[in-house]
C-alpha cells in the first residue's frame, strides 16, 4: 500500500523526506511466547515529535541508519508518540511502541530481539496509515471520545504516553533498587522486621532527589515521585531562568525547588544543590544529556552514601573514582524502557493532567514542505516549545 508520510533514509542532503512511501504488513509479536500477528490498519490522527527523531535524522545524515530500517526496506517511517484511529474497531488508540521476542521489554537479553514502531525496524506514526499488531493498540478509557471524534486537548495530553510510561518505570526501578540497597541498614536502624525495613527503605530512597535536566522526562519523573512521595525533597537543576514558564510549570507540578546552573565553577553549583536539598542526594537522576551530570554527582559529591545514580541521558560517558565510589556503597543504573502496564497507567494519569498546556502545534503543511528545516529551525531550535506536535488528520479532532 502506498501512503503519504515522512521517513528517514541514509542521505547527507535529505535524511528526512515527505512523500509517497510503501508500507508493508509484516507479522510481529508483542512478547516472547506469543504468536506473530499480521497488523491491522490504523490512521494517524495526532503525532508528537521526540528527541529520538532528531537523533535518527542525524544518523541518516551520517549514513548510519541501516540497522534501524524494517526488513527489506531502505527507509524508516518515523514517529512513535500520538493518537491513531483504528477503522476496523471504530476506536482511537495509543500505539504500544515496543514489541518483539522478549518476555519483558524492560529486561530483554542479548539473545532476544525487539522492534520499536517509528524508531527501530518498524514503521511509525508519521504517515497517513500504517499496520500495527492489534494487541499493541491500547484503548483510551471511555468518556473522552464522542461521535468518533476526540478533543484536541486530550490528544495533547496523550502525546506524552510514551515518555510518561518511561518515567513510571523509572520510579518503579528506583523503588526496587532503593529497597534492596538499604533495607538491611533500616532493619538495624529501626530494630524492625525485614518487611517493615523494606517499606522504610523504599520510601526513604526519595528523601532528597536531584533531577539534573528539565526537559519533559525530568519534569515527569519529578511529578511522579511527588505524587507517590509528597514529602520528598526534589530539586531540579537546569540552565533556564527560574522565572521561565517551563521552570514555573515544573515546580508547580512537583512541589520542587530549583537551582539554576549558571555558576562560575562546578564546586559552587554542587554546593548550591546540596544547600537546596538540605544534604546530599539519596537519588541523582541525570536527564540533561550533558557530561557534567556525573561530575556533579560523583566528583563534587552531590550523591550521598548508599545513594542511587539513575542515568537517563543518552550520550554522556560516566566516570568516577572507584575508591570513594566503593566505600560510599553507591549504585549506578540505566534502563530506558517500559511495559504495557506502565503505558496503560500513563494514559490514565495523563487524561486528568494539565500537560496539554505545554504542547504547541506546527502546521502540517509547514512540516511536510521541508521536514529537515522544520526540525532544525523550529521544533528543535533554541527557544522551541517543550513539546511540538502536529494534527495529522483533522477530521477526527474537535
Locations of regions flagged by a protein language model:
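C-terminal hydrophobic helical "lid"/dimerization subdomain
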Residues: 1-3, 178, 268-271, 279, ...
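Residues in the short beta-alpha loop(s) of Rossmann-like NAD(P)-binding domains
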Residues: 238-243, 315, 338
Amino acid at each position: 500500500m502506498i501512503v503519504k508520510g515522512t521517513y528517514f533514509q541514509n542521505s547527507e542532503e535529505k535524511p528526512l523526506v515527505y512523500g509517497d512511501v510503501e508500507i508493508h504488513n509484516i507479522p510481529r509479536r508483542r512478547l516472547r511466547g506469543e504468536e506473530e500477528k499480521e497488523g491491522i490498519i490504523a490512521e494517524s490522527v495526532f503525532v508528537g515529535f521526540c528527541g529520538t527523531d532528531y537523533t535518527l535524522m542525524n544518523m541518516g545524515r551520517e549514513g548510519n541508519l541501516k540497522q534501524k530500517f524494517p526488513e527489506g526496506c531502505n527507509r524508516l517511517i518515523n514517529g512513535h508518540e500520538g493518537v491513531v484511529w483504528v477503522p476496523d474497531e471504530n476506536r482511537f488508540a495509543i500505539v504500544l511502541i515496543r514489541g518483539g521476542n522478549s518476555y519483558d521489554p524492560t529486561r530483554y537479553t542479548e539473545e532476544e530481539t525487539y522492534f520499536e514502531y517509528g524508531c527501530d525496524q518498524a514503521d511509525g506514526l508519521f504517515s497517513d496509515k500504517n499496520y500495527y499488531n492489534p494487541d499493541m493498540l491500547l484503548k483510551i478509557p471511555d468518556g473522552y471520545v464522542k461521535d468518533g471524534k476526540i478533543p484536541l486537548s486530550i490528544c495533547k495530553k496523550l502525546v506524552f504516553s510514551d515518555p510518561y510510561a518511561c518515567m513510571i518505570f523509572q520510579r518503579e526501578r528506583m523503588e526496587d533498587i532503593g529497597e534492596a540497597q538499604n533495607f538491611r541498614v533500616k532493619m538495624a536502624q529501626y530494630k524492625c522486621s525485614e518487611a517493615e525495613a523494606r517499606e522504610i527503605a523504599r520510601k526513604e530512597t526519595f528523601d532528597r532527589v536531584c533531577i539534573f535536566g528539565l526537559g519533559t522526562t525530568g519534569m515527569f519523573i519529578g511529578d511522579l515521585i511527588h505524587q507517590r512521595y509528597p514529602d520528598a525533597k526534589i530539586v531540579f537543576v537546569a540552565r533556564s531562568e527560574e522565572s521561565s514558564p517551563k521552570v514555573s510549570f515544573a515546580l508547580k507540578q512537583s512541589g520542587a525547588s530549583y537551582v539554576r546552573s549558571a555558576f562560575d565553577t562546578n564546586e559552587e553549583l554542587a554546593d548550591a544543590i546540596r544547600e537546596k536539598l538540605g544534604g546530599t542526594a539519596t537519588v541523582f537522576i541525570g536527564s540533561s544529556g550533558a557530561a557534567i551530570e556525573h561530575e556533579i554527582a560523583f566528583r563534587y559529591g552531590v550523591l550521598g552514601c548508599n545513594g542511587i545514580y539513575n542515568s537517563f541521558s543518552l550520550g554522556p560517558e560516566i566516570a568516577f573514582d572507584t575508591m570513594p565510589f566503593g566505600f560510599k556503597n553507591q549504585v549506578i543504573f540505566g534502563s530506558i524502557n517500559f511495559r504495557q502496564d506502565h503505558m496503560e497507567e500513563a494514559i490514565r494519569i495523563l487524561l486528568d493532567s494539565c500537560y496539554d498546556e505545554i504542547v504547541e502545534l506546527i502546521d502540517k503543511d509547514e512540516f511536510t514542505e521541508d521536514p529537515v528545516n522544520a526540525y532544525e529551525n523550529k521544533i528543535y531550535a533554541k527557544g522551541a516549545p517543550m513539546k511540538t506536535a502536529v494534527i495529522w488528520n483533522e477530521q477526527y479532532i474537535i
